[in-house]
Amino acid sequence: LKSQITYFLYYLGLVFLGFLFFYAFPSIALLSFVLVSIYHFGEQHWESNSFNTNLYKGKKIFPIILHGSTFFLVIFINNIDVVNDVLASFNTIFLDYSVLETLLIILFSIYMLMLLSFKLFRRYFIGEFLFFLLLYFLTMNSTLIYGFSVYFIFFHSILSIKDQVSYIYEDDKSQYIKKYLINALPYLLLALFFLVGFYFFVDIESINILPIIFTFLAAITSVSYTHLTLP
């Protein structure tokens, strides 16, 4: 119990430092958040496939970066006004739709060509193409929070839990998943407690909630790899 409390306080401390960095240096923090997130989401996606064990580190970086970059470009393009509103709240630069659109076409084309060109990647082509097609239509017809939440829950968090279970217990059998969820339950309940409190005691309609959520995600993502030190 003592080690869990120590780890929890350590993690909260890192998140708090992330908040301070984000508000002290918003432009640098935003860029760092996007770069870290591109790698994080791309790595998480490809870690769910067994392909990475057959590649040396220098080669497997390409699908990771291309997947993560394409993901964020799709999110930003289909929510450009909301994203720029968030950026405006931090007094930083705006994103240009035409530039993002051109960049998306180029990177997505390179990504698809890479998957088709290498035999090891070829079997992932259809899955990746359909994934981004669905993501595009999802984010085009929904709000930024809703679209990102659907992706985060079904395409990121579940895979992340599986990877963490495998890392901690060196296996992802149901008994270890159950053990992991039991150990994580106090943190889940604490998060729900603060979420309910925030909902009932904060006038959401009177404040711009997106910058707060964005900053929180940035702080969490910036220290996301610390979960690998969980005993």
Features from the language model and the residues they span:
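Extracellular/periplasmic helix-loop-helix junctions in multi-pass membrane proteins
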Residues: 199-214
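Short, amphipathic, aromatic/basic-enriched membrane-interface segments that mark the entry/exit
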Residues: 1-7, 115-125
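Conserved small/polar residues in nucleotide/adenosyl-binding loops
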Residues: 226-231
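Membrane-interface helix-loop-helix junctions at boundaries between adjacent transmembrane segments
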Residues: 17-67, 71
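Long hydrophobic alpha-helical segments that form multi-pass transmembrane helix bundles
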Residues: 51-116
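Hydrophobic, membrane-inserted alpha-helices
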Residues: 10-19, 111, 129-137
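Membrane-water interface signatures at transmembrane helix termini and the short loops
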Residues: 123-160
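Alpha-helical transmembrane segments and their membrane-interface exit regions
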Residues: 34-46, 154-163, 220-223
